[in-house]
Design a protein with these regions (language model features):
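Short cysteine-rich clusters marking metal-coordination/redox-active sites
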Residues: 82, 130-133
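N-terminal post-signal-peptidase region of extra-cytosolic proteins
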Residues: 58-75
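C-terminal segment of N-terminal export signals and the immediately downstream linker at the start
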Residues: 21-57, 65, 173
């Protein structure tokens, strides 16, 4: 190893602490709570843990048919959790009937979802996913009720509902 290569490698090592300190800032910029540790689990590993239809939505970013989810009519008090890793994503008090055919919410639990640009349909949409397992949940639109004006439109198969009187499931790895 010559001196130049040695110095280059040492400069990379010296930068590692700074990069690791920036990771929480990157998560926060994506709207993710830095206290939620993303799972380092390949999507394929979830195949045996969730139903095939849920897998297609969560990890292949498919969309269920509008009006097909039993969660559309869910009005009881409770929490909607990710169907893959069980991270709480929405509180029932933020659910409303949007007329879209999908369970809709005015806001997620702060820091429990991340967003990204989605160009699958020619125009730009904002896709959101579970901050922990990365499972696709749905899209957020700017046509919701006041005061936020947001409609978090979720695939019902990407969620599970837990009644307020029941204990939340332990997070699944």
């Amino acid at each position: 190893m010559n001196r130049r290569n040695f110095l280059q490698q040492m400069s990379v090592l010296a930068a590692l602490p700074a990069v690791s300190l920036m990771w929480p800032l990157r998560l926060a910029a994506m709207g993710i709570n830095p206290a939620i540790v993303p799972l380092n689990k390949p999507h394929e590993a979830w195949r045996g843990l969730v139903a095939p239809e849920a897998y297609r939505i969560l990890f292949e970013e498919q969309t269920e048919e509008p009006g097909s989810s039993e969660l559309n009519g869910e009005e009881r008090d409770g929490t909607f959790i990710c169907a893959a890793c069980y991270l709480p994503l929405f509180e029932s008090r933020n659910k409303y009937e949007s007329g879209s055919g999908w369970p809709s919410f005015t806001q997620p639990i702060a820091g429990h979802v991340g967003t990204k640009a989605d160009y699958q349909l020619i125009f730009l949409r904002t896709e959101y996913h579970c901050a922990r397992c990365g499972g696709h949940q749905g899209h957020v639109f700017k046509d919701g009720p006041p005061p936020r004006g947001e409609r978090w439109c979720n695939n019902g198969l990407a969620l599970k509902f837990v009644l307020q009187t029941e204990s939340l499931s332990a997070l699944r790895n």
